[in-house]
Amino acid sequence: MLTFQQMILTLQAYWDRQGCALLQPIDLEVGAGTSHVHTFLRAIGPEPWRAAYVQPSRRPKDGRYGENPNRLQHYYQYQVVLKPAPENILELYLGSLEALGLDLKQNDIRFVEDDWENPTLGAWGLGWEVWLNGMEVTQFTYFQQVGGIDCKPITGEITYGIERLAMYLQKVENIYDLVWTEWQENGETRRLTYGDVYHQNEVEQSTYNFEHSNTEILFRHFAEHESEAKRLMGDTGEKAEGAQEKAAGTRLALPAYEQVLKAAHTFNLLDARGAISVTERAAYIGRIRNLSRQVAQAYYDSREALGFPMCKTEARA
């Protein structure tokens, strides 16, 4: 039996053999691996890219106080990004399942059409859910647009739901019973479970998300992150002659994107708290999307100004 951490190590080794850079998770709260700078921004422009990483993901509304056996407000995704998407991407994915010990002939693996969209990132793609014996374990996406910019070439994204896949491999019904790791000590097998690591976190974070987050502070933080992102994009709000031109020459896409991610997580906390109405929700999503598009364009422009250097690297190779 593969432990939870052995699963991750196996996927790391497999995708390393496929030429992926094994990266670390982004050190900010995000709702999915797609929000990582090395997926969202790297999907923009012509430069090739192959990367894989684990991404802790937070979705405050999904918290259930640690009482639901398969629903969490904090969980893990294993993210693989291949640009351009190789013709054999499905075969590569199935190979990763075999590396995890799955017999493809003995299991019902289905690709169910499910196109993907992330409104806050101004991103969408064509894709499939992957069902393993009736349970969704992976999302496949061919990015068509990111930040409102057409993807040329197309980026292929594979997002594994690590906990769900582990539940099947370990044959457990409750996520908290997953074996995170096990070892021998004094002749006995010792185990650390998912619940040992994260159950208290689910209880307390759910309590915070739904009951104790300070909405006044969160609204202020959202406005601050939005304002800072705009400033870093050269939108100073000043009308003085030359002010906008000066600011436009110092657009900082990467720091601005971090502010966008912070604004997005703050919005998710407010949404979980029930502090945003249905009509306000659409407006907030639109504000974040507009920022994402500005960042995407600024990043594209900066790479273009550099001559898309990774295209040259690939040509030399």
UniProtKB/Swiss-Prot annotation:
<dbReference type="GO" id="GO:0005829">
    <property type="term" value="C:cytosol"/>
</dbReference>
<keyword id="KW-0648">Protein biosynthesis</keyword>
<dbReference type="InterPro" id="IPR045864">
    <property type="entry name" value="aa-tRNA-synth_II/BPL/LPL"/>
</dbReference>
<dbReference type="InterPro" id="IPR002310">
    <property type="entry name" value="Gly-tRNA_ligase_asu"/>
</dbReference>
<comment type="similarity">
    <text>Belongs to the class-II aminoacyl-tRNA synthetase family.</text>
</comment>
<dbReference type="Pfam" id="PF02091">
    <property type="entry name" value="tRNA-synt_2e"/>
</dbReference>
<dbReference type="InterPro" id="IPR006194">
    <property type="entry name" value="Gly-tRNA-synth_heterodimer"/>
</dbReference>
<keyword id="KW-0030">Aminoacyl-tRNA synthetase</keyword>
<keyword id="KW-0963">Cytoplasm</keyword>
<comment type="subunit">
    <text>Tetramer of two alpha and two beta subunits.</text>
</comment>
<dbReference type="GO" id="GO:0004820">
    <property type="term" value="F:glycine-tRNA ligase activity"/>
</dbReference>
<dbReference type="GO" id="GO:0005524">
    <property type="term" value="F:ATP binding"/>
</dbReference>
<keyword id="KW-0067">ATP-binding</keyword>
<protein>
    <recommendedName>
        <fullName>Glycine--tRNA ligase alpha subunit</fullName>
        <ecNumber>6.1.1.14</ecNumber>
    </recommendedName>
</protein>
<keyword id="KW-0547">Nucleotide-binding</keyword>
<keyword id="KW-0436">Ligase</keyword>
<dbReference type="GO" id="GO:0006426">
    <property type="term" value="P:glycyl-tRNA aminoacylation"/>
</dbReference>
